[in-house]
């Protein structure tokens, strides 16, 4: 098993866990009636399409603009959650992340945390943007937004690098779209 497949397996396992935890709140929120799609499912549908229409930098900038300063700590927590073993699961943060993933108009924080680990995080490492990937591992406030900003600065003016990242990440992004659709039903 390769490193990427282990990362992918862990991330997808964490995604399943997150989506499963939203099932109860989803049923309560809609009273069992009507059609409701989880926020993370909508974001998983939107992001690849935005990349193909506007490019990775524009799509990432738009998604980051939807993450408020108050949510940056939650984004940090989400990246840590998807990255590896969470020894001491912060129940409040977990509830916030699950709420973000489950609410129809939200999902930006949980989806960005997910893709910054895999597949975009892996594509960045493969493209030699290890400084950005390592920035995601730092502790401290707002480090994820800072690392994403670093990614955007690295992409400016280097269209070939952006296209390489798009091509490398797109298969994984499309898989996440399928997985969230299947789990969100």
Task: Show where each model-derived region lies.
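Small/polar/charged residue-enriched interaction surfaces, especially the RNA/DNA-contacting tracks
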Residues: 1-185
